[in-house]
Amino acid sequence: MTNIVWHQHPVDQAARAEQKGQNPVLLWFTGLSGAGKSTLAGALERALFEAGFHTYLLDGDNVRHGLCKDLGFTVEDRDENLRRVGEVAKLMVDAGLVVLSAFISPTREERDSIRARFPASQFIEVHVSTPLSVCEQRDPKGLYVKARSGEISNFTGISSPYEAPLAAELTIDTSKGDLATQVRALIDYLTAINVINADKAKALA
């Protein structure tokens, strides 16, 4: 690695962000399977996109069809899955995008490792805190049934622990209130920290 140096591009993150008229950021949605991470992140992305933002949503299932298709679900593979996603998200933020990532990401160490790649103002942890009982009742992919029967091992929330964030920037329980209200809470937060400026906030009203 000593012979590899970082090549400085003539166009930097600030220039890309200025061209797009937005402040790049990573919103990291974490929570149990079935908590509503992808639904919430997708609804927020749709609202931002329609208001003229340049966005991209990284989804836990989708990246395993390509970027991480060679990985399984051992502890080591799950760590590598998130390491890769964190690096991709960093590149996307450097490109000036508003990036949304929806991953169970069960350990604080994993999430903190990704947070450490970004300036404090560019990483927003969103804990989708929907209770296990609700997630299991929803069970959209039938995974909890398989986990309870022993067909799936190391399943987060059943046979493997989930470590809730200690200081997430936002906490949303999708079993309380409706999706529009939850998206509004996210938009209000992004406006308060100036990710969304006043002019674009009007388009999201």
From Swiss-Prot:
CDD domains tied to this protein: APSK
Any Pfam family: APS_kinase
EC number(s) given by UniProt: 2.7.1.25
Superkingdom per UniProt: Bacteria
GO molecular function terms attached to this record: adenylylsulfate kinase activity; ATP binding
Record flagged with keyword Plastid: no
Binding site for ATP: 31-38
Residue pairs linked by disulfide bridges in the UniProt entry: none
Pathways involved: Sulfur metabolism; hydrogen sulfide biosynthesis; sulfite from sulfate: step 2/3
Biological process annotations from GO: hydrogen sulfide biosynthetic process; sulfate assimilation
Catalytic activity: adenosine 5'-phosphosulfate + ATP = 3'-phosphoadenylyl sulfate + ADP + H(+)
The entry's keywords: ATP-binding, Kinase, Nucleotide-binding, Phosphoprotein, Transferase
Residues forming the catalytic site: 105 (phosphoserine intermediate)
InterPro entries reported for this sequence: APS_kinase, P-loop_NTPase
Family: Belongs to the APS kinase family.
Main function: Catalyzes the synthesis of activated sulfate.
Protein name: Adenylyl-sulfate kinase
